């Protein structure tokens, strides 16, 4: 009888423990959901409050986005800073291989880019096209972003993406050849861009520039070959 009673008591204690553990997990899950929702709504103070309560700062939604990734997509500098200051991982990539550093570089979000660099962003990580942050930044002519990447990180200026394009190549092929793009080309060359790296079809940057009638860029490339 005693053994039976003791066994029943142990079972009750075990079940209570399991129930408490489930409640804790449920509470943490609810906080994660609330954290992601608060970030989506740009509610910085709520985000900070939830983090203080123990919400997982690197929780992800169905798209693999962390709170910091969501804040970056929205260019919410205040919330992004709060999350980074609290220790958010800046290198986590979502389901489409974006992370805060890569996306900020691609979209020209200089403030968030600086925050991610300060927090130890890995410049070698690549997006779904196999490109570094420098490649789309060069395509779009984001001069300040390009300078930030070239001077504050060890990003590979000659990295080749899945299309066979370097930052220099993309700055020619996908641009209109205006003064901004000419400045981009000069910057890249000044920081070691190889003007002779061809694309997957064996076409060089100079040949692309000529095909687009980008005379000024052609001159810059010829000078860069010396």
Please name every model-derived segment.
Residues 22-70:
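N-terminal segments that cap or nucleate solenoid repeat domains
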Residues 195-226:
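Leucine-rich solenoid repeat scaffolds
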Residues 16-17:
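C-terminal motif of bacterial Sec signal peptides marking the signal peptidase cleavage site
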Residues 37-42, 70-76, 103-109, 136-142, ...:
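Ankyrin repeat A-helix N-terminal signature
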Residues 43-51, 76-84, 109-118, 142-151, ...:
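Ankyrin repeat structural motif
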């Amino acid at each position: 009888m005693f053994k039976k009673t003791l066994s029943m008591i142990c079972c009750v204690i075990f079940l209570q423990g399991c129930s408490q553990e489930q409640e804790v997990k449920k509470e943490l899950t609810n906080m994660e959901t609330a954290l992601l929702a608060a970030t989506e709504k740009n509610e910085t103070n709520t985000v900070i409050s939830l983090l203080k309560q123990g919400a997982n700062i690197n929780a992800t939604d169905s798209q693999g986005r962390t709170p910091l990734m969501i804040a970056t997509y929205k260019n919410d500098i205040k919330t992004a800073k709060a999350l980074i200051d609290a220790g958010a991982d800046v290198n986590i990539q979502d389901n489409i291989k974006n992370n805060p550093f890569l996306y900020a570089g691609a979209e020209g979000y200089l403030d968030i880019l600086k925050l991610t660099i300060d927090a130890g962003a890995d410049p070698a990580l690549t997006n779904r096209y196999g490109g570094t942050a420098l490649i789309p930044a060069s395509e779009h002519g984001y001069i300040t972003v390009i300078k930030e990447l070239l001077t504050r990180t060890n990003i590979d200026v000659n990295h080749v993406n899945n299309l066979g394009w370097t930052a220099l190549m993309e700055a020619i092929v996908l641009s209109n050849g205006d003064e901004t793009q000419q400045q981009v080309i000069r910057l890249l060359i000044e920081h070691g861009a190889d003007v002779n790296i061809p694309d997957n079809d064996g076409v060089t940057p100079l040949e692309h520039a000529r095909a687009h009638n980008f005379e000024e860029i052609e001159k810059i490339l010829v000078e860069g070959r010396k």
